Amino acid sequence: MFSFEKNSLKNTDKEIFDAIELEVKRQHEHVELIASENYASPAVMEAQGSQLTNKYAEGYHGKRYYGGCEFVDIAEKLAIERAQQLFGVDYANVQPHSGSQANAAVYNAVLKPGDTVLGMDLGAGGHLTHGSKVNFSGKIYNSIQYGLDENGDIDYKQVAQLAKEHKPKMIIAGFSAFSGIINWQKFREIADSVDAVLMADIAHVAGLVAAGVYPNPFPYVYVATTTTHKTLRGPRGGLILCNNNPELAKKFQSAIFPGIQGGPLMHVIAAKAVAFKEALEPSFVDYQKQVLKNAKAMEKVLKQRGINIISGGTSNHLLLLDITNTGFSGKEAEAALGRANITVNKNSIPNDPRSPFVTSGLRIGSPAITTRGFKEKECELVANLLADVVFNCGDEKVENETAAKVLDLCDKFPVYK
C-alpha cells in the first residue's frame, strides 16, 4: 500500500525532486518569452497530477473497451462540451496527445499516402507538420510549400498559383512563427477553387480565437487543430475541432482511435477540461486583450532600439526578430539572454543563410509574461533589457546587470503565490 507521505517524490526519488525544484526556481527567476510557453494554473496541474493517470480508457466516453470508466467518462464529456462552447463548434476530439498527433490524425482522415498537401514553409514560419521534408507530413505526402510576400504577409497570390498548379487535396492555413493575421476567407476561396480540404492549425492563437480577439477560422475551414497549452494555458496536449460536418467528424474519431492512438491520457483530458472552464470566464478575454497589448508594447521598444521585426510588427502574441544587424546569431543571442535570465528561442527567418541550429533570428511572445501579471510598462522594460543583451552578446557586465534587473522584476511578479 502506498502512503502519500512515505512515498512522496522527495523521499522516493531525490534526483527527480531536485530537478523539479531547480526548474521551479528557474521559472520564478527568468522572464519567459518563448511564444509557445505559458503557465498552467494550480487547478490544471492538480487535475493532471491526479489518480486519473491510473485509468485505462480505450475508446470514447460511453463506448469504452474497459470497465470502470464511468467517472473518467464524466471528465471527457465535460472537456468536449467546454471545447465546443469555447470555439462555437459541434465537434471536439480532446484525446490527441499533442498538436502534432492532432495534425497526423487529420492527415490520416482526409488523405492517402502520396496525396498533395499545400502548407507554409518552415522557413517562412510554418510548422514541421505542415509538410517539412524531415517530418512525416513531408515524407508520406507530396508536400508543396508557400511563403511570405515582400511585406512579410502570407503570399496569397503564391498560394493560389501553387494550388492551381499542383491541385492539393488539402491546404493548411496556420503557423509556428508568423506575427500576422490569417485571412481565412481568402484561403477558403483558394481551397474551393481546387476542391481542397482547408485545415486551420491554430495552435498558437487558439486562446486569442476563443476570446474573440483573433479571427475565428470557422465557418471557412473544414477542420481546425490546436494544442491546449500556449495561449490556452492548459496542459500540453492536442485538440481537433469541426463544425456542421458529421461525416468528417466520424473520420476524425477513428483517425485518433484506433488510428494512431490507443488509451487516452485521462488525467490530461481532465486538465484540459479545467483549462477550458477557465477560458470560458470573462477574465480570460481580458487576459488575451492584455497579451496583444503587451506584444505591441515590446514591438514599439524593439523598433526604437533598431531591431528588425519580420512582417513589420505583430498583430498577435508573437514577434519574429531579425537580429542580423547586431552581428550575432540567434544561437549566440539565445545563450546570452539565458545568462541574463531571459528565456527565448533562436528561430530561422525567411531566406535565412544560417542553419536552423544557428539561425539569424529570435522568436518571442507575450503569453507567459502576461499570465505573470506584466502590463505594458513591464513589457517595455523587458524589451529594453532584451535589446541591451542582444547588441552586447558575451559582455559579462551587461549580462550580469540585466540578470539583476530581471531578478528584481520577477520577485515583484511571482508565477505561483
UniProtKB/Swiss-Prot annotation:
Record PROSITE patterns: SHMT
Query: What are the protein's UniProt keywords?
Result: Amino-acid biosynthesis, Cytoplasm, One-carbon metabolism, Pyridoxal phosphate, Transferase
The family database entries (SUPFAM superfamilies) matched by this protein are listed as: PLP-dependent transferases
**Single GO cellular component term:** cytosol
Query: What InterPro entries does this protein's entry cite?
Result: PyrdxlP-dep_Trfase (IPR015424), PyrdxlP-dep_Trfase_major (IPR015421), PyrdxlP-dep_Trfase_small (IPR015422), Ser_HO-MeTrfase (IPR001085), Ser_HO-MeTrfase-like (IPR049943), Ser_HO-MeTrfase_PLP_BS (IPR019798), SHMT-like_dom (IPR039429)
Could you tell me where this protein is found in the cell?
Cytoplasm
> Could you tell me one molecular function GO term of this UniProt entry?
pyridoxal phosphate binding
Q: Name one GO biological process term.
A: tetrahydrofolate interconversion
Locate the site labelled Plays an important role in substrate specificity: 229
Instruction: Give the protein's cofactors.
Output: pyridoxal 5'-phosphate
Q: What are its E.C. numbers?
A: 2.1.2.1
Q: What class of enzyme is it?
A: transferase
Which positions carry N6-(pyridoxal phosphate)lysine? 230
Q: What reaction gets catalysed by this protein?
A: (6R)-5,10-methylene-5,6,7,8-tetrahydrofolate + glycine + H2O = (6S)-5,6,7,8-tetrahydrofolate + L-serine
Q: What does this protein do?
A: Catalyzes the reversible interconversion of serine and glycine with tetrahydrofolate (THF) serving as the one-carbon carrier. This reaction serves as the major source of one-carbon groups required for the biosynthesis of purines, thymidylate, methionine, and other important biomolecules. Also exhibits THF-independent aldolase activity toward beta-hydroxyamino acids, producing glycine and aldehydes, via a retro-aldol mechanism.
Q: Could you tell me what this protein is called?
A: Serine hydroxymethyltransferase
* Upper classification of the organism: Bacteria, Pseudomonadati, Pseudomonadota, Gammaproteobacteria, Thiotrichales
Which gene carries the instructions for this protein?
glyA
